[in-house]
Swiss-Prot record:
Motif (Hairpin): 103-104
Gene Ontology biological process terms from the UniProt entry: DNA-templated transcription
The name this protein goes by in its record: DNA-directed RNA polymerase I subunit RPA12
Gene: Polr1h
Residue ranges that the Swiss-Prot or TrEMBL entry lists as coiled coil: none
Organism from which the protein derives: Mus musculus (Mouse)
Keywords, comma-separated and alphabetical: DNA-directed RNA polymerase, Metal-binding, Nucleus, Transcription, Zinc, Zinc-finger
Subcellular location, record wording: Nucleus, Nucleolus
Length: 123
């Protein structure tokens, strides 16, 4: 006796697998479309009449406005008593970012408010 297959986990169109939600590949020359993640398969005839449209948007060269150094986030943080190794100025702004995995410490970026020299410290 064969067990009945449970109903799908997702309500979706044929772009996504109804079992795991992954994006299904485009139909090819095979008789079935098979989900590469969970192995769910549908008959390729179920995709009949489906239209796939793609578009690529190219931005004009030079269309973005570069930020000046004064506008970056590194100079908007708090200032601490830390001597710049390049110019010797006392006072550096800092900000933190999670650059490594979540179970490791953050990276602290220090920026000299005088000469804009930047250094980092892994904490």
């Amino acid at each position: 006796m064969e067990l009945a297959r449970p109903r799908s986990n997702f309500q979706s169109d044929l772009d996504f697998c109804p079992d795991c939600g992954s994006v299904l590949p485009l139909p090819g020359i095979q008789d079935t479309v098979i989900c590469s993640r969970c192995g769910f398969s549908i008959d390729v005839r179920d995709c009949e009449g489906k239209v796939v449209k793609t578009s690529v948007v190219f931005n004009k060269l030079g269309a973005t406005i570069p930020l000046s150094v004064d506008e970056g986030p590194e100079l908007q943080g708090p200032v601490i008593d830390r001597r710049c190794p390049r110019c010797g100025h006392e006072g550096m702004a800092y900000h933190t970012r999670q650059m490594r995995s979540a179970d490791e410490g953050q990276t602290v970026f220090y920026t000299c408010i005088n000469c804009k020299f930047q250094e980092k410290e892994d904490s």
